[in-house]
Design a protein with these regions (language model features):
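Membrane-interfacial helix-loop segments of redox and metal-homeostasis proteins
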Residues: 2-142
């Protein structure tokens, strides 16, 4: 049925696309996405606080490499929220589109492999972002 025929039939046009599990693409719904975004916020606040503390106490610039941890946590949270994909769930072979807590198992082996690969990419990207920001912080003249 074409879009014109669908509209002419008097049925309302669809306004949103349902989000569902897609191997290696999407494994979390709105509640889990919000949780990942909050983790990103917490990591960002911790990163700024740690940098401020290290500068305030006059710690040697090399100590700013500690920023890799909270920055990686922040990057991981934001990446997972943006991508609608939980790295931890992907590594465990589970997904959740409902309320926080209950999860469902991924049954297909090929789907699990795609999820694990995506999880690894998110983890590596998060660490890379953390390392890059930490190195820049070490080089800051403050």
């Amino acid at each position: 049925m074409t879009h014109t025929a669908f509209a002419a039939a008097g049925s309302p046009a669809p306004t949103s696309i349902a989000i569902d599990y897609q191997p290696g693409v999407c494994n979390i719904g709105p509640a889990e996405i919000s949780r990942r975004r909050r983790a990103g916020h917490v990591g960002l606040i911790a990163s700024v606080a740690l940098l401020a503390l290290l500068v305030a106490v006059g710690a040697p610039p090399i100590a700013r490499l500690l920023l890799v941890i909270p920055v990686a946590v922040s990057a991981s949270g934001y990446l997972q929220a943006y991508l609608k994909f939980c790295a931890g769930f992907g590594a465990k072979g589970i997904y959740n589109f409902g309320d926080l807590g209950p999860t469902e198992k991924v049954a297909d082996a090929a789907a699990k492999a795609l999820d694990k690969a995506k999880s690894m990419r998110i983890s590596l990207a998060s660490f890379g972002i953390g390392a890059l920001v930490a190195i820049v912080a070490v080089l800051l003249p403050v």
